[in-house]
Amino acid sequence: MEADGAAAAAAAGEASTEAGARPLAPEEEALRRNTDCVYFLASPLTCKKGNECDFRHSDNARMNPRDCWYWLNSNCLNPKCPFRHPPIDGMFGAPTTGMPAVSSHYAPFNSGKQLVPCYYFKKGNCLKGDRCAFYHGPQSVGNNPSEQVVKVSSLPLEQLQTQKNDLLGIKDSVQSTNSIQHGAPITNERGKTAVDRSTVNSARTATVAIPVASNAMSCPKSEKVKSSTPAALKESFTTSSGGDHPECYQNHFPMDSDPVRDWNQSYEMPPADDLPQNSREADELLGESSPGFDVLVDNDADGAAYLHDEDFGGDMYPVEDYEYAPADFDVRAHHERERFNGMDEQDQMGHMYDGYERKRRRSSERSMERPFHSERRFLQRDRDRVEMDGSDLRHRLRRRRINESSLAISPERNGEQRRRDERYRERAHGHRSHRDHHQSSRGSTLSSRLQGRIKLPGRSPDRVDTRSEKERDRRRLRDRLSPVRRTEFQGTRHREAGQHEEQTQRRSSELALGSRNADGQHLTKDVPDSHNFPHRKNSRDSSKANGSVEPEASLDFEGPKPLSVILQRKREAAWANGTSACSPKQDKSAEVSHRQASLAEAEKEGDNIISSDEYKSGSGDEEFRDEGHIPVEGHGQSSSHGDKLEAEDIIEVDPVENQDADNYDQREGESYYEPIEGQDYKSDDENAYEDDDEEYDDDDDFARKVGVVFS
């Protein structure tokens, strides 16, 4: 090998010197560009020219010791070929002596190769080189491959083996080739030719196939995996005697046939009886047939897409849980579904989910009985449209909308739902027409809507009574307010004349009592704290702002009284009011003058001054309520001027507006005068009539009214 390389380098040097003497043709220059530089192949540093070198400098070819087969046959067109391009004899016009002919050296390597071209060699990068089991060579169109094989096989086998051993050293491959060639075939019970198992094992490990001279070709295991349809071979699967599963797949081919002719023949499918079934049907190997195949055979191809659509196949035009009646409607199955869903009972959920159950049942039936249902489904086109009026989509939607509105307001929706389900089942049987059913359903739903409106539940009667009672109490309190505030803010003047007379008479009696208290008849009872009874200065200021300024008097404050004392004083006050109402009018001027004198004296003496309208405010009476205390009338003494009067703590009461108002106030249990504990209360007017005691004996009624006022 080293001698051959030196000779090639010398030939290249001579060619370069000759080329320098004469100009090179374009073909020769291109050929030189594709020839590897021998100095660069030895080492990149040995070529002194570098990039100016006329030969090819390829790192891949330098690392790859294999020569390019196409280059040796003068037809390598790959400028980046990873194989070596050595100098060829006669390339540069001077034949090299001592180097054997290229064709004689490289032709024998194709003798043992298959006729299958190497895929990687066509791509220009087969790393196996001459050891590849596939064909490395040009794909000649005009030449017959059989003739080339005959020419190659004419050389002696021993000479070929010695040349390969000398050049490439592949003695092991030749030995494996000989072992495969001399393998003895065996015959089984069926009389079929089979390859010896040892021969098969050696063929699996070997990479070089049998030579063509034996008129037999083998396909290696790698080729079996790559090619789905092996060419020029007829496969038959043989098993051991009595075995269910094949031990191995073995290749059989006629020994006297031409392998090239068998290569061009088409691959024949083995019989279905010899194929392993693995407990499956034979048609499963070919794929499952279309579900609508029987329909397509009957020239009903227009429903093929309909059959393949699972969602569209069951219900023709679904709208929520309503749909057109299918052609395969089964009344018995429908009633079974109704019984399953609880349609016979008063169950609304069964009716709601009935559509879902029908759809699910249809899907299962469609998967189990597809051809039968498909045939019956196509018979629907011949049905009369009159039969489908009962399942009209518009009627269903209208009926559903009316039923939903009636169910929302009708308290008898369970009974109505039950009747509606019964009508639905009768329509399924065909006992009632669409028009009668429509009219009855419309009439029943309208009547149910009217019943629902009439029986619409209202608020609780307890709450209504409580609220109305509170409103009445508030109205009564507003009616009992002072006439001054009513005339100033409400503008009601129809009772003003009678009220003025009664107010004048009551003030006279109160001034007499105030003068007696101012002379020294004060209370001996302790006065409570000021925070329990706030000052009434704000009430006096408000009365002055309203324009009703009354004379003032100094009155002592008494404090809280028990309920029995208050009721007793209430009766006495009513008795005193009756006597004052009968007094003549000529005494008014004297009483007013006496009251003004007492008020002037009180302004000089006392520090705590309260207005008469604070406890009376036009009617002469007030009720002070502070945290559960019983109202106390205006014979008291305020604690200080600094206390503030809360507006909600003072309720001005008009006890006597007329005879009806007086009786009303007496029933309400309001008190107007309270006697001092330990002393006897005597009015100036002793001539009074006795009031009806039956209206004031109910203490509990008065306590309840007081609680209502606080609330």
From Swiss-Prot:
Pfam family, one: zf-CCCH_2
Biased composition (Basic and acidic residues): 364-376, 413-427, 460-509, 585-594
Bias (Acidic residues) ranges: 648-663, 686-701
Species assigned in the record: Oryza sativa subsp. japonica (Rice)
Bias (Low complexity): 1-21
Residue span of region Disordered: 1-23, 221-246, 339-376, 405-561, 573-701
Gene3D superfamilies: Zinc finger, CCCH-type
Name by which UniProt lists this protein: Zinc finger CCCH domain-containing protein 32
UniProtKB keywords: DNA-binding, Metal-binding, Repeat, Zinc, Zinc-finger
Feature: compositional bias, Basic residues: 428-437
Domain of life: Eukaryota
Zinc finger (C3H1-type): 31-60, 62-88, 112-139
Listed GO MF terms: DNA binding; mRNA binding; zinc ion binding
Signal peptide stretch: none
